[in-house]
Amino acid sequence: MNKSMIILCAVLFLTYIIEENEALKVEDLPEPESYKRAKELAVKDAKGDKKAEGVAFQILKDNRKDCMTNCKLVPTCHLLSPECCPKQTPVCLQLDVVKSG
């Protein structure tokens, strides 16, 4: 009984690792021009404050990822993630967050 449970857990764990490595992630996609412009605006608004830039970049990154599954999250989702908003493209459908969401 114990051996079979250990083997089952090992197989499930390996399957998870393989799927995770092969899944397309948001970070793997090239940044769209509209997202790059949003980052430039964040730098401009931070006025040289590196901490504010970091916070703004993290918010943009989080919103980009969250917009992939929910285009109504923020009004600028179509700019942050044009792959998925307003219409999901084939690339969008391959993303790990879209498949699991």
UniProtKB/Swiss-Prot annotation:
Keyword rRNA-binding: no
MF terms in GO: toxin activity
Tissue expression profile of the protein: Expressed by the venom gland.
Signal peptide positions on this chain: 1-23
Predominant subcellular localization, coarse grouping: secreted
GO cellular component terms given for this protein: extracellular region
Keyword Secreted assigned: yes
Superkingdom: Eukaryota
Subcellular localization: Secreted
Membership in a protein family: Belongs to the scoloptoxin-10 family.
Protein name: U-scoloptoxin(10)-Sm2a
